[in-house]
Every structure is written in C-alpha cells, then in structure tokens.
C-alpha cells in the first residue's frame, strides 16, 4: 500500500507526514511531495522515527515520481487562510494548484483514491472531478473531500459541553466544509440531552471553528495541526477500507444528487473506495431548516468549481 502526500512541506503537510509515519500500518510506503526544496529533508527527518513505514521525499515542479504506484493520494497543497479571509478567498490561487496536481494524478495513478484537503473543499473537489472526467478516468467512488476536521471539532466541543467521554462521542456532520454548509447532527449524538438554547450557538461554533484558529494565530497560520490529525484519521480509514475492513467516515463525495452533486455524509469505505453512501438519518426541525438554508450556497460553490474547468 502506498500513500502520497502532495503539499508535504506546508503546515498541514509536515504534521500529516509525522502522523502518517506514526499511524499507518507496517509495510506502508509514504511518499512526500512538495514544490519546496525542503521536502526531501522532511522525509529524512520523519524517516528517523522507528516505525515500519517507508518514507521518501520528492521536490520540484513534477509530482510524478511521488505518485507512481500510489493507492491513496492526499492533496494539502495551496495557500492557507489569514485573518479577514474566508475559504472562498483562497479559490483563485488554490483552484489552479489542485487542477495541476489532479492532471498528474489522472496520468500517473488514475485508480488511486484521492482525498482533497486544499480549501475551499466545496469547490476544489468539483474541480478535481471535472479534471478527472476530462481525462476519462473519473470514478466517483475514489474522490473525497476531507471534512473529517468538522467531525473532530464536533466531537470535542460536544464532549466538553456535555461532560461526555470524548473517545466515545460520535457526531455525524453533513453538507460541505465551510461556514453554513457545515451541519453537525447534534440530535443524533448518543447520551446527549439538548436544551433549545444550546444547539444554535454550538452549531455556529463548529461552523466558525476554523476562523477561531485563524484569529487566535494572529496572522501566523490556520488550523494545521488539528487538520493534519483529521487527514491522518481519514487516510487510515481509507487504507483500512482498501484492505478489506469495514469503516464508516463522514466525507464529501458525489452521491445521488438528492441535496447537491457533492455532499458530505456517512460513507462506508471499502476496496473500491466508496462502498455505500449511508442515509443521513432523522433530522431535528433545526437541522432540517439549516439543511434547506445551506443548499443554495453549497450548490453555488460546486458550480464555481465546474465552471473553472469547463468555462
């Protein structure tokens, strides 16, 4: 099994490289790529950690050597948010970066499962899909927007608020990966009783948690460490699924189009990537209303990505 990280010298990428070196199954090959010349050094650095994960680093304009034979590709390349920016401000730079990398994936490892971390995820996943489609290699079971950080944040905040064991707290998060499109299904959390006045502030905190980090870092970056852990968790789940285990994660995928072309919801992962898209389950009145309210935003984000490739 080979996992490639594109954007491995960045804030998310370096932390992700460390976590994958520690957490991937023994015998996995880990390829780290970034345009930055420091990348082979990042690989040497993490290679000194005593785990049975084999690491190689690649830098320069062409990611092809890192992608050869990859089963899983994680893309975190791009610019990060700064105070005053929202995820859509990143679009102009990151859209082109994702397009270029996916063009290489389409040629070098078209059957790989691809996890998009680069924001704005609502849009960059649509870009990736259209590039793969133009190349004639698109398989919707193998393209994912990594929305796991919304799940991690929800689990953390719910457990804190309700005094629950965080390791046993599970919160499905549906929709997209920015602002109002992030919808934590708090009504489905086991052992949590909610007052009406708790739900909206908590949902808003989860939606705006990325901005909370950007502001707290005072211009020094965005959520890199928690995002790296979220991406590592998702990568581990993908690897387990590809190895034949049954794993369920919330992730942003192309499904039946009931709500939008791409939509984050619980997905059963398996040997082909997406094995089954699971139902979102019963919603509270608040959640139903929030879902209806977000859909125009989500659909517009997706359309932006499609138009970027197709004009």
Curated annotation (Swiss-Prot):
Its EC number is 1.1.1.37. The active site is at residue 177. It comes from the Bacteria. The keyword Protease does not apply. Substrate binds at residues 81, 87, 119, 153. It catalyses: (S)-malate + NAD(+) = oxaloacetate + NADH + H(+). InterPro entries: L-lactate/malate_DH (IPR001557), Lactate/malate_DH_C (IPR022383), Lactate/malate_DH_N (IPR001236), Lactate_DH/Glyco_Ohase_4_C (IPR015955), Malate_DH_AS (IPR001252), Malate_DH_type1 (IPR010097), Malate_DH_type1_bac (IPR023958), NAD(P)-bd_dom_sf (IPR036291). Homodimer. This is Malate dehydrogenase. The gene is mdh.
